[in-house]
Amino acid sequence: KLNENWLKTILNEGAKDRPYMATRMPKFGASQTGSLVTLFASTDALGEDKPVTFPEPEHRIKADARLMIGDQALSCIKCHTFDKYAATGIQSLDMTTMTRRLRREWFHRYLLDPQKYRSGTRMPAAWPKGRSVVPHILNGDSDVQIEAIWTYLLDGKNAKVPSGLQREAIELRPGDRPIVYRNFIEGLSPRGIAVGFAAKAHFAWDAEHMTPRLIWHGAFIDAAKHWVDRGPGNQVPLGDHVMTLPAGPPLASLESLDGAWPDGNPRDNGFAFKGYSLDKAGVPTFKYRWNEATVTDTILPFETSPDNGLQRTVTVAPANKLENAWLRIASGQNAEESDGAVIVDGVRFQIEGKEPIVRTINNRRELLIPMTVNAGETATVRIIMTW
């Protein structure tokens, strides 16, 4: 069941993946065991890994896997630890180490029929006779569900913690009015501002970079890290489908579309944060200056399915004519046009009011919107983000 790399580690260096067992593994050394690794692997092999095609983007697949592992579905966390989090029952093997140790095809076979490989095991059969006990997730497809869990666990210790383990959580739940949470947020500068909506589509705006940096679905924020004791460290979004938007100056004047986007601190590029105001519904509008131009940025939920999106409106009002001005809303490895929109690394951007362009610069795909405008006028663009 172990992959070749982990077999080498065990035979050459030893390992302690089961701290609850009072046993020690000798360190034999590579000179004594070098040929055994290949022999073990070839003797136990039962064929090639079968490819599995996912029906959804990977960020949604991982969210479904997280749901399955947590206390709302298969409850793997009742027996298995998850990095630093103890299981709610017996303390079995850490799930975040599994993909580092195991062979993918063995993982599939074992989950389908644990008793076949370990008679008398406490491991329950979640896919008896190949049928899932959670048919409402990923259409009940057993192969897809197991592959989803494997893909989720490939993130190792960086995998998002399943539901049911953070028992001291202080979850902030938006109601009639959005919640504005100003604190240290993972992936942002220390000037992060998270905004949560009852529509379960949320974002985090970075007052250092003058732009939204994170968007996500589901639960909003767990405030326990910052509201208990001295509140050290950064908090990650509590929900799923967390997507990252580019840092750096949001606006730039480019003499040529071949020119690189400015980097460094936006304050060194003529930007100054001017705070935010709340409308009657409690929705913030962020304000900043870019040289002689005033800029506002408002983000609201956008109703769609299967999960709501976000609607962003950016308005630029210059004191003098603004030429060759561009707004950068996305930067990623992949970008493709689809039904009048542009999809960049899993986020779909639909632009209203302007004609965007996609360019390749420094091996990155950037989505830019022209914001050239005369003095005394305004340039406004509406951006609908779904993911």
Please tell me what each predicted stretch does:
Residues 17-19, 46-47, 70-92, 116-119, ...:
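Periplasmic/extracellular electron-transfer cofactor-ligation site
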